[in-house]
């Protein structure tokens, strides 16, 4: 049997840091309130730097390729999960292909599942390796949500940061991705939105979110999907070594960990330092944990994410 196995990870975050103390000067909020309600102390932001969605994706990809120890010429697919592409077209994936000077006889495309984008991209890549003969796939999660937040809205501007994370998936006989599950429900599409300026030229494409409703649904749906993927995989909760959640809200993360019976020290947390980096949050956290020596080859990881759409998903894998 052929598995899709993570061979390398990489990430990138902008240099500029926006702290809660900085936000106290911008909106009516406090460090104590943000930490209690969300769990974010600081976030990295593009601001006026040369960084953008494409450059961050490229830098994360280079680090993943380096760790994987592969020649970039062997990459036979690029999938980018992002909701904040630099262009409507071309895709971010094609721009990554250009900057990495990858060969042209490969597919390269973006998917937009908002904060669940990386898990969606990982699931698609897994299917191409299992069923279509792909050997090396570059999967990237990247977002620049600070470019679309309303900096006068204290309920949302405190949440987000910018960044990118990437993995190289390689066809392998040893177990890698065991299962993925993806769900969506467009009936809740109005709960998290950022409208395109194409149709309403006078509007500003600010992010809007009904936080209380999203929080309740996230706790419920993530709880259900982690149960579903564990049952589908035939594992017990005790077989999970690490939970790598989407870093949206510490209270949501704690609810999922409690449901799994996992202590906090078995949950990879970067939310305090990064904030919610949308599609980048899971690969950012994975990269940080691998490079810190926490997660090791052979560990069983549960990844889960929930975002606008509403779209949510989970992946269970052996590193």
UniProtKB/Swiss-Prot annotation:
Domain-level remarks: The last Arg residue of the ACP-binding site is essential for the weak association between ACP/AcpP and FabH.
Gene3D superfamilies per the UniProt record, alphabetical: 3.40.47.10
InterPro entries to which the protein is assigned, alphabetical: ACP_syn_III_C (IPR013747), ACP_syn_III_N (IPR013751), FabH (IPR004655), Thiolase-like (IPR016039)
Subcellular location: Cytoplasm
Class in the EC hierarchy, top level: transferase
Positions of transmembrane segments: none
A Gene Ontology BP annotation from the UniProt entry: fatty acid biosynthetic process
Region listing for ACP-binding, in residue ranges: 247-251
Free-text function comment from the UniProt entry: Catalyzes the condensation reaction of fatty acid synthesis by the addition to an acyl acceptor of two carbons from malonyl-ACP. Catalyzes the first condensation reaction which initiates fatty acid synthesis and may therefore play a role in governing the total rate of fatty acid production. Possesses both acetoacetyl-ACP synthase and acetyl transacylase activities. Its substrate specificity determines the biosynthesis of branched-chain and/or straight-chain of fatty acids.
Reactions performed catalytically: malonyl-[ACP] + acetyl-CoA + H(+) = 3-oxobutanoyl-[ACP] + CO2 + CoA
GO cellular component: cytoplasm
UniProt similarity note: Belongs to the thiolase-like superfamily. FabH family.
Gene source species: Coxiella burnetii (strain RSA 331 / Henzerling II)
Gene Ontology molecular function, alphabetical: 3-oxoacyl-[acyl-carrier-protein] synthase activity; beta-ketoacyl-acyl-carrier-protein synthase III activity
Origin: domain of life: Bacteria
Subunit structure: Homodimer.
Protein name: Beta-ketoacyl-[acyl-carrier-protein] synthase III
Residues at the active site: 115, 246, 276
EC number: 2.3.1.180
Keywords linked to the UniProt accession: Acyltransferase, Cytoplasm, Fatty acid biosynthesis, Fatty acid metabolism, Lipid biosynthesis, Lipid metabolism, Multifunctional enzyme, Transferase
Pathway, per record: Lipid metabolism; fatty acid biosynthesis
